[in-house]
Swiss-Prot record:
Its cofactor is FAD. Its EC number is 1.5.1.54. It catalyses: (6S)-5-methyl-5,6,7,8-tetrahydrofolate + NAD(+) = (6R)-5,10-methylene-5,6,7,8-tetrahydrofolate + NADH + H(+). The lineage of its organism: Bacteria, Pseudomonadati, Pseudomonadota, Gammaproteobacteria, Enterobacterales. (6S)-5-methyl-5,6,7,8-tetrahydrofolate binds at D121, Q184, Q220, K280. Catalyzes the NADH-dependent reduction of 5,10-methylenetetrahydrofolate to 5-methyltetrahydrofolate. Is required to provide the methyl group necessary for methionine synthetase to convert homocysteine to methionine; the methyl group is given by 5-methyltetrahydrofolate. NADH binds at T59, Q184. It comes from the Bacteria. Keywords: Amino-acid biosynthesis, FAD, Flavoprotein, Methionine biosynthesis, NAD, Oxidoreductase. It comes from Buchnera aphidicola subsp. Baizongia pistaciae (strain Bp). GO terms for biological process: methionine biosynthetic process; tetrahydrofolate interconversion. This is 5,10-methylenetetrahydrofolate reductase. The active site is at E28 (proton donor/acceptor). Transmembrane segments: none annotated.
Length: 295
């Protein structure tokens, strides 16, 4: 098996050798919930920081204040330890404006200058949000001159009426001060490219960064896609058929798929990529190794 991996990674680097122009990469983590998972996260960070990413980001998780504190604490630790810009996700779904102002001021005073502003998931469909992402962006800008990234949805947000509504909403976020949009993960590249072209057509000129999900566990992917409106192509299901208990082969196939996606997106002019790591480094590191010191 070691020989297989050795040959595979040599092939991987061969495939990516023609990517020579500057590329920005970033990696997303979630806050660890115990000592063991935090130890694992630091091992992941130690490896991925060698790739000199543009930034790391840390999810907000659920909307509880305890979870927000976990995000804040780990963001500060990562930035201090690595010296790399670390971006907290901030959701507004279950927080008041005053609470959000306190969080924003605390981040700014701690040296955090970049926030990923999100509404957050609604778990009670009978509860209509009082604050949306565009409101959060305005609130953050009223506190300080944060750099603000937002979410975008090539396959349309699950709650959006249609693609046009999604574009209108993204444009409102840009007008409020967003300077980057990171997309939900996807496997239909044509869908992403149509979304990018639609953004350009509607004078949305910020960087649209594709979210890349390196597959290591197909069952886990299906779980995520079921709540995020991400379509799973039939060919992808066929690729992983019968591999539920073969994670090594799954990782190799997942790497190959992600490599092909990066190659095609690069050929279409994309120069920034955001990796959803799930606090794992192996596949993301292998894919990005050729990009070392490019950002």
């Amino acid at each position: 098996m070691k020989l297989v991996y050795k040959n595979y990674h040599e092939t991987l680097n061969q495939h990516l050798m023609n990517i020579c122009e500057k590329v920005n990469i970033s990696f997303e983590f979630f806050p660890p919930n115990n000592i063991l998972s935090e130890k694992n996260l630091w091992q992941v960070i130690d490896k991925l920081k060698l790739l000199t990413p543009k930034f790391f980001s840390v999810t907000h998780g659920t909307n509880s204040k305890i979870r927000a504190t976990c995000t804040s604490n780990i963001v500060k630790k990562i930035k201090k330890y690595t010296g790399i810009e670390t971006v907290p996700h901030l959701t507004c779904i279950n927080s008041t404006e005053e609470e959000l102002k306190v969080i924003a001021k605390t981040y700014w005073d701690s040296g955090i200058r970049h926030i990923l502003a999100l509404r957050g998931d609604i778990f009670n469909t009978n509860c209509k949000p009082k604050i949306y992402a565009v409101d959060l962006i305005k609130l953050l800008k009223s506190i300080a001159n944060f750099e603000i990234s937002v979410a975008a949805y090539p396959e349309v947000h699950p709650e959006a009426v249609n693609a046009k509504y999604d574009i209108i909403n993204l444009k409102r976020k840009v007008e409020a001060g967003a300077t980057r949009a990171i997309t939900q993960f996807f496997f239909n590249i044509d869908c992403f490219l149509r979304f990018r072209d639609l953004c350009v057509k509607n004078n949305i000129t910020i960087d649209i960064v594709p979210g890349i999900f390196p597959i290591s566990n197909f069952k886990q992917l299906l779980k995520f896609s079921s709540v995020s409106n991400v379509s799973i192509p039939k060919w992808l299901c066929c690729m992983f058929h019968g591999l539920d208990n073969d994670l090594n082969t799954s990782r190799i196939i997942g790497s190959s798929i992600a490599i092909d996606m990066v190659k095609v997106l690069y050929s279409e002019g994309i120069r920034s990529f955001h990796f959803y790591t799930l606090n794992k480094s192996e596949i993301s590191f292998a894919i990005c190794k050729i990009l070392e010191n490019k950002s």
